[in-house]
Regions:
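Immediate flanking context of iron-sulfur cluster ligation sites
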Residues: 42-59, 80-86
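Iron-sulfur (Fe-S) cluster-binding segments and ferredoxin-like electron-carrier domains
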Residues: 67-82, 105-108
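Short cysteine clusters
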Residues: 61-64
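Amphipathic alpha-helical segments within well-ordered protein domains
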Residues: 34-35, 52, 69-73, 87
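Charge-rich, acidic-biased intrinsically disordered regions
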Residues: 76-86, 112-120
């Protein structure tokens, strides 16, 4: 089901406010981290937001997708630039799956080898 991306930020904001009441230090820490990360010196706002969108996709964060897509649009990112950033995210996720596949083969060899090793 597709989200209503115009209504979702309002709903999310209500949950964040609730979380802020329940765990104020955690939310304050997040806000400080977010503000610090947004004060880039070498990256312009558009580039930073395109990176954030790609990361939002790889971490499967709907709230991040909504916030950073809005920020990217406001920073002047085109639909084509967003699509290219998403292409990078897709490739990275595929690459991560390939790299972690090697870990499974390692684990299989270790576990299977241990099961077949003669008892001492």
């Amino acid at each position: 089901m597709m989200l209503d991306w115009n209504a979702y930020p309002v709903e999310l904001s209500a949950r964040v406010k609730e979380m802020s009441r329940l765990a104020p230090n955690a939310v304050a820490g997040f806000i400080a981290l977010d503000k610090g990360a947004n004060k880039t010196v070498h990256l312009d706002a558009k580039t930073r937001e395109l990176i954030a969108i790609a990361i939002a996709v790889t971490t499967r964060c709907d709230g991040c997708i909504g916030v950073h897509t809005d920020r990217a649009i406001n920073a002047g990112a085109t639909r084509e630039e967003v699509a290219e950033a998403l292409g990078v995210a897709i490739a990275l996720n595929a690459g991560a799956a390939l790299a972690y596949s090697a870990r499974v083969l390692d684990a299989y060899a270790a576990i299977d080898g241990a099961a077949k090793a003669p008892a001492e």
